[in-house]
């Protein structure tokens, strides 16, 4: 569960390393926590030098991994080691060209198919 002020790792090669959530944009208008597949507004806290994304830039990201376990439709419970997100543009396309680490199958059902196709492993 991701809420405002939560620090997240970036799971792509867009140039950012760490994000801090500042707002949850989910299906519900006044959703308090973000889960896998929810879109958040975040600020970049740490970035790679000489890359297009810079520190203190406000961006949108989609949550791909959370430490809080979640139950799949088939009854399997999945929990990851870290909280991670992929930076997206206004249309929902990823800004990076690679995605690192495993991501959840639920992203395919939420129309983030481009992120799923870039991922090395889908659980």
Curated annotation (Swiss-Prot):
SUPFAM superfamilies: Ribosomal protein L14 (SSF50193). It holds the Pfam family Ribosomal_L14. It is found in: Plastid, Chloroplast. Binds to 23S rRNA. GO terms for cellular component: chloroplast; cytosolic large ribosomal subunit; plastid. Belongs to the universal ribosomal protein uL14 family. Part of the 50S ribosomal subunit. Gene3D superfamilies: Ribosomal protein L14 (2.40.150.20). GO terms for biological process: translation. Keywords: Chloroplast, Plastid, Ribonucleoprotein, Ribosomal protein, RNA-binding, rRNA-binding. It comes from Oryza sativa subsp. indica. This is Large ribosomal subunit protein uL14c.
């Amino acid at each position: 569960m991701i809420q405002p002020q939560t620090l997240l790792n970036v799971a792509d090669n867009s140039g950012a390393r760490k994000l801090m959530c500042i707002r949850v944009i989910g299906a519900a208008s006044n959703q308090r926590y973000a889960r896998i597949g929810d879109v958040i507004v975040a600020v970049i806290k740490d970035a790679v030098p000489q890359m297009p994304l810079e520190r203190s830039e406000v961006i949108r990201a989609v949550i791909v991994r959370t430490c809080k376990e979640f139950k799949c439709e088939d009854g399997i419970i999945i929990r990851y080691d870290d909280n991670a997100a992929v930076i997206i543009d206004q249309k929902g396309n990823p800004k990076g060209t690679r995605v690192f680490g495993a991501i959840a199958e639920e992203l395919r059902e939420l129309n983030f198919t481009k992120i799923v196709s870039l991922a090395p492993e889908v659980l």
